[in-house]
Amino acid sequence: MGGYKGIKADGGKVDQAKQLAAKTAKDIEACQKQTQQLAEYIEGSDWEGQFANKVKDVLLIMAKFQEELVQPIADHQKAIDNLSQNLAKYDTLSIKQGLDRVNP
């Protein structure tokens, strides 16, 4: 389990967060597509009536909500990627090296 000197961050946990964020993004997109397809299927089916309309409406609301999660999840992935890249560079920063000389 690699860490980053001077920062309480576990490299393995950061990598795990990157993997989980990517999986979450993929799963949300797949779920949104399936929800949308189910709503469209119900709309085109012979199932009619107030209950069918309510089910379709709920599915459309869910699909819209899932669609609205795509951008925040993408932003989250980008933040984790940036964190990972910046943590890897931390020990090479001149200010960090200067602090190490002052406070070994």
UniProtKB/Swiss-Prot annotation:
List all membrane-crossing ranges. none
What does this chain do? Virulence factor that is important for the establishment of infection in the host. EsxB is required for EsxA synthesis as well as secretion. Mediates together with EsxA the release of S.aureus from the host cell. Also inhibits host cytokine production and thus modulates dendritic cell-mediated immunity.
GO terms under cellular component: extracellular region
Main localization (coarse): secreted
User: What organism does the record attribute this protein to?
Assistant: Staphylococcus aureus (strain MSSA476)
What is the name attached to this protein's record? Type VII secretion system extracellular protein B
Q: Does the keyword Secreted apply?
A: yes
Q: Which gene encodes it?
A: esxB
* Compartments reported by the entry: Secreted
Give the record's family classification: Belongs to the WXG100 family.
Q: Say which domain of life the source belongs to.
A: Bacteria
How is this protein organized at the quaternary level?
A: Homodimer. When mixed with EsxA does not form heterodimers.
Keyword match Secreted: yes
